[in-house]
Amino acid sequence: MFLPTTPEEVKRLGWDALDVILVSGDSYIDSPFIGAAVIGKVLLHAGYRVGIIAQPDVSSTADIGRLGLPRLFWGVTAGSVDSMVANYTALKKKRRLDDYTPGGENTRRPDRATIVYSNLIRRFVNSVPSPSALSQRERGLPPPIVLGGIEASLRRVAHYDYWDDAIRRSVLFDAKADYLLYGMAERSVLDLAACLRDGRDPLGVRGLCYIAKEPPAGYLELPSYETVVADKDAFIQMFHTFYRNNDPVSARGLYQKHGDRYLVQNPPAPTETQAELDAIYALDFERRQHPFYEKQGKVKALETIGFSIATHRGCYGECNFCAISVHEGTTVRWRSPESILAEAEQLTKHPDFKGYISDLGGPTANMYGFECPKKLSKGICTAKRCIYPQVCPLMPVDHQPQIELLKKVRRLPGVKKVFVASGLRYDLILCDQTHGNEYLREVVEHHVSGQMKVAPEHVEDNVLRLMGKPGRGALLEFKRRFERLNRQSGKQQFLTYYLIAAHPGCTEADMQRVKEFASRELKIHPQQVQVFTPTPSTYSTLMYYTERDPFTGQPIFVEKDLRRKARQKEIVTDHQGHKGAQRKTSKRPS
């Protein structure tokens, strides 16, 4: 079933009021790939009455107030993408299109949507007469506002904002909200809802951020907001501590002073067990837009997520420009084959399914089914990364589980083709001496749509080091194997290379060498080139703001002039006579 979004739907369900109202910057797509839908269905399955208001009109309180007041809390998310990333290009031009808005026109998601929606809710709540049967109001309090989603998660502590070109406070202060749940948050939101329902103090919930007058005992102190605004060295120190305390096994709680109050971040929620993941993806998602919003126009995102299957969560690639580490986590956890097969079978029964599974994968497709046992028991290593600069010998890289999974899914009745579109880490394939070639052969022969996406992002060693990406040697060896397997299979398939221009440390001379390398070694004229966007809470953004390598302290070149950023991209793409399409961060392979 769909979560209700109108009073008429609530009435048809026999509900007198809602426990939770979710507010989202995306249109309401009932899909396991949409965070608001997942959180809503998890709460609904636990017995809570949940409604959703998608992309509310912010010019008045009529839209936000159509479902009344919730008994327990408001849940606010900017949507699947940070609203500033959704609304502006890397060159700070307004985007015309939005894949998550009906009709595709980018007119419904406000800038800094988390803050705007929180303000809108408060305006509505203040307009409601005091007498109410709602449990929070019985205690003399309005229902709390709880922030979530990627925008809130990545802005939960003091952070650099590219669009203001300044350090901003935690979004919890700017939104004047009550709580913030970071990460994937299914377990955290259930714990929070239970506390609010039962009248218990929620401040111990893992994965929760809140504002306090005094710092909690035993938590690590981050340099204050005022300090990091004034001192880039302090900001670097702050980010190191923040980044290192995202692992559920080893993380400490954190606090950061803002003025005369404190932002408190509890340790992260434990990663989901396989049984929990299986249960989440077994919920009854409709995999389409709610009819109320569908009447306003189709959403382009459904073309990608409508019939895709998530096999796992998390990524230990830790690319410095990627936000997955501090949102979804660096520990990979995966669903059981039985759960994935059951979902694939359900897809075949969907009236709109044509036999094609658009993607079977995760943040990185070929991380399914294996993880470091030391990390699982003791937490992440603080002195080194899992697969950079080399794959750690403790990482038991094994593609066999995914090989077997792909075979089983593609053999299901009603399935014509299963694509692996998430993107691959070719260094993992090269590292797997036992099953790496077998896996690549499987993908080449059965799971490519004509082009395989890989993301070297650059080819110059000095830039790759700052990105945290493997060197060009691994790329060339992977290309050689891919081409050999294509010849053996009698197929004409190609590699598509994603590249980044104007990353910290990258010069125009570096991009000229990228162009020459692509022509000489890759035999292509690159099309998929994007200008680096400094998004909150990544190491690359830290480099952009401080103009330093945070790991060595050495100064680095950072291109900040918008025209020269565009020039870096054009050096590689100008032979095409156009500048190419901007690609969404969420679709880039790791």
Placement of each model-derived feature along the sequence:
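Glycine-rich beta-alpha loop elements in corrinoid/cobalamin-binding modules
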Residues: G35, A54-V128, G140-H258, Q265-N266, ...
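Terminal amphipathic helices with adjacent charged low-complexity linkers/tails
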Residues: S59, P202-A234, F239-D247, D260, ...
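Conserved SAM/AdoMet-binding glycine-rich loop
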Residues: L22-G25, V38, I52-I53, D57-V58, ...
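Short, low-complexity, charge-dense intrinsically disordered segments
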Residues: Q576-S590
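Flexible glycine/acidic-rich beta-alpha junction loops that bind and position SAM and/or redox cofactors
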Residues: D82-L91, L154-R156, E186-D191, P215-P216, ...
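N-terminal [4Fe-4S]-dependent radical SAM core
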Residues: M1-A17, S27, I236-S308
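Conserved, mostly hydrophobic/aromatic
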Residues: D178, C315, I340, V454, ...
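N-terminal pre-triad scaffold of radical SAM enzymes
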Residues: V23-Y28, Q296-A323, Y356
